[in-house]
């Protein structure tokens, strides 16, 4: 969803987490959440945006990262942004809910000490992808994953609010 991409030239002391938490709500539902956020940090403005786009092509592995725990500052940052963006309650299609992002991907690059370029690109269904190889031996046979392949998911729904979309009022939005 490049039309919802964001770029900021932050000061070196500015918090990337704070910027993301301030910026994500301004993107509305046009990026089709839940999805991923690709974040590029460093280089120039152009490089930060390229890093953000490249980051979106990485494999979704947040469940694995949460299970094993962070092993670097970058993984700690990914988890912090993931948890805090989901805590915003934006939810699927911006209608409220527990899951706004499925993963956070970050790539960084050295930059001038006087600035901190940060680019953020959200993905939508158009950028979700699968990897496969065509070897010329015949028709591609892509097998859908089994339900057992998906992780078991549980959450506390006590703070959730059920919304009747057929009868929602402006005040309830």
Task: Give a label for each model feature.
Residues 1-173:
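Non-transmembrane, aqueous-exposed alpha-helical and coiled segments at domain scale
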